């Protein structure tokens, strides 16, 4: 799998587009040789995510340097933490982490909550225009794409249930699969795709559930979504987090990692999230 090493955010803010294209790598431009470097695994960074990590780096100053590795699919960031290729990662919610640990026999842990990113159902397109403007317009026999990894597929199915399109026979804290659908009055065809492909499928399906990670890079406007995930008693499992190895407090980077958490959990970063995500992400600390 192709990895793209990014400059730490001190320099990335100036040239992130170029770096993403050419896969260059570097560390922070800080001149303090005593600074501790912490390697952070992420997925594609939206402008808002870039801005909040820029703010974290600014708060940290020269004490800690953030060095980012950008991954192209969800299967890799946790493996990179487990194999000590990065020190921490920030890309997933609790449900995904718990499921990944079970499937891979690992014990990565959440060390900080960050935000919740409500997923949305988007209309398919035809001739460059949305086919539908509301859920009720989705016709009988329509095809709806959902992510195929267990946790995001489950989340997508619960979203479709909340939107009134299907019913599933399990509770909101259990992983739902297509086999758990107990009611499908419109005879919808639910198509499983890699999460990175759901947005690009909109030209060939009637609707798709798209994770926020891929919304902006696909040129989608979340304000045009047919349905938005609502907060309820089951929302905690969808909180995004910073993850590390279970022995992270014994590592040489422990003090630096704690400073990163403290920097992230400031009103300054909260303000950046609120001002730059335009409602796509909501702080949860």
Kindly give the residue locations of the regions a language model identified.
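C-terminal motif of bacterial Sec signal peptides marking the signal peptidase cleavage site
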Residues: 17-21
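Bacterial signal peptide processing site
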Residues: 23-25
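Flexible hinge/capping segments at coil-to-helix
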Residues: 30-36, 123-144
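Short, polar/charged alpha-helical segment
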Residues: 37-38, 42-69, 76, 80
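Short helix-initiation/N-cap motifs at beta->coil->alpha
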Residues: 68-79, 172-200
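Ligand-binding "clamshell"
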Residues: 99-111, 126-128, 204, 209, ...
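A bilobed periplasmic-binding-protein/Venus flytrap-type ligand-binding module shared by bacterial periplasmic
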Residues: 118-134, 238-254
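Periplasmic-binding protein-like
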Residues: 154-161, 262-284
